[in-house]
Amino acid sequence: MAQDSKILEELYTVIASRKGTDPDKSYTAKLFARGRGKIAQKFGEEAVETVVAALSEGKDELVGESADTLYHLLVLWADCGVEPAKVWAELARRTGTSGIDEKKSRAKK
């Protein structure tokens, strides 16, 4: 796998390919088999662990927990049928817009 920003797309492709495969042979397949609720729960747990690492542990721990969080987010996206390109497009749309203005525009919809 690449060591640049494309790694997320590559990882997403691998993750999506595990959907419907043998859960005894793949942790990712096991997550899919357990359903969206479990996937979302695991993402939430990893997000909390990332926050804890940021507040009380070293950079190495933060990096590791961040990788776990991103992995579980990608599993959640794959389960929901959301491809990374859609998220990147939304981030690009928001680039150059202040967070305050962007939030105001969502409130009006």
Swiss-Prot record:
Provide the Gene Ontology terms for cellular component: cytoplasm
> What catalytic reaction does the record list?
1-(5-phospho-beta-D-ribosyl)-ATP + H2O = 1-(5-phospho-beta-D-ribosyl)-5'-AMP + diphosphate + H(+)
Instruction: Check the record and name the Pfam families matching this protein.
Output: PRA-PH
The subcellular localization recorded is: Cytoplasm
Keywords per UniProt: Amino-acid biosynthesis, ATP-binding, Cytoplasm, Histidine biosynthesis, Hydrolase, Nucleotide-binding
Please indicate which superkingdom the organism of origin belongs to: Bacteria
Pathway info? Amino-acid biosynthesis; L-histidine biosynthesis; L-histidine from 5-phospho-alpha-D-ribose 1-diphosphate: step 2/9
Q: What is its EC number?
A: 3.6.1.31
Q: What GO molecular function terms would the record report?
A: ATP binding; phosphoribosyl-ATP diphosphatase activity
Q: Which GO terms describe its biological process?
A: L-histidine biosynthetic process
InterPro entries per UniProt: HisE (IPR008179), PRib-ATP_PPHydrolase-like (IPR021130)
Q: Where is the major localization of this protein?
A: cytoplasm
Query: Which HAMAP family does the entry link to?
Result: HisE
Q: What is the similarity comment for this entry?
A: Belongs to the PRA-PH family.
Please report the name of this protein according to its UniProt entry: Phosphoribosyl-ATP pyrophosphatase
Species of origin reads Paramagnetospirillum magneticum (strain ATCC 700264 / AMB-1) (Magnetospirillum magneticum)
The encoding gene is hisE
